């Protein structure tokens, strides 16, 4: 988040070119900074399907993630009664984040009736505060099995962030980076075609959702982040 998530801006410190994913985008610092404008009130958006263009942009696993100033969280909750629940949240602006909203307000509704296995696919790894919320949820709910699958690592060079990620795993969460198969799964289960307007501004009937087409270097960037995550969790 641009000033949330402890200053959660998806841009990260520049490093030597050989250490960067090959399709890294320009950092925000390279462009002229726009004038600051007042942001509308914060909100967490909840739904079942993400527009395809939003998914492709927000979940792209580049390192310099200019413009990606929000977090998307797609969740699957499986309970012992063979019920499966899916949905997604996205946050706006600078207050609570999607992770905190999910683990504080959404997930407890599913934990009142017994054990649950939860997988969250997030566009970026959690900030320090959200990591603390996740750890608290795990410690309160011993019957919760949690897996967090991340497209990118947020400010992974910061010692507080590294410690927060280790704290999540110590609390019982499985952390890993998204791979091609995960993108295909999320595309199939959480993404919908973009709304297209005709010449009169009326929404056209959406067509069928096509197959997920990976961007260049998706798998290579995933391996890059896997190595960084492994370093953090040692």
Regions found by a protein language model. Give the residues of each.
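Zinc-dependent deaminase catalytic domain
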Residues: 1-234
């Amino acid at each position: 988040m641009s000033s949330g998530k402890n200053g959660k801006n998806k841009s990260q410190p520049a490093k030597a070119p050989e250490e960067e994913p090959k399709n890294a985008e320009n950092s925000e610092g390279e462009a002229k900074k726009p004038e600051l404008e007042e942001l509308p009130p914060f909100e967490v958006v909840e739904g079942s399907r993400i527009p395809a263009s939003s998914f492709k942009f927000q979940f792209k696993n580049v390192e310099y993630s200019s413009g990606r100033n929000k977090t998307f969280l797609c969740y699957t909750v499986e309970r012992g009664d063979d019920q499966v629940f899916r949905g997604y949240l996205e946050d706006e602006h600078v207050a609570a984040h999607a992770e905190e909203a999910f683990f504080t307000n959404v997930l407890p509704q599913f934990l009142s009736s017994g054990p649950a296995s939860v997988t969250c696919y997030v566009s970026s790894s959690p900030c320090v505060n959200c990591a603390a919320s996740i750890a608290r949820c795990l410690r309160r709910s011993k019957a919760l099995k949690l897996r967090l699958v991340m497209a990118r690592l947020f400010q992974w060079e910061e010692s507080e962030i590294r410690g927060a990620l280790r704290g999540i795993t110590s609390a019982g969460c499985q952390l890993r980076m998204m791979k091609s198969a995960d993108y295909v799964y999320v595309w199939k289960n959480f993404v919908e075609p973009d709304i297209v307007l005709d010449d009169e501004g009326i929404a056209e009937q959406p067509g069928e959702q096509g197959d997920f087409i990976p961007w260049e270097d998706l798998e290579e960037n995933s391996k890059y982040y896997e190595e960084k995550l492994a370093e953090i969790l040692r």
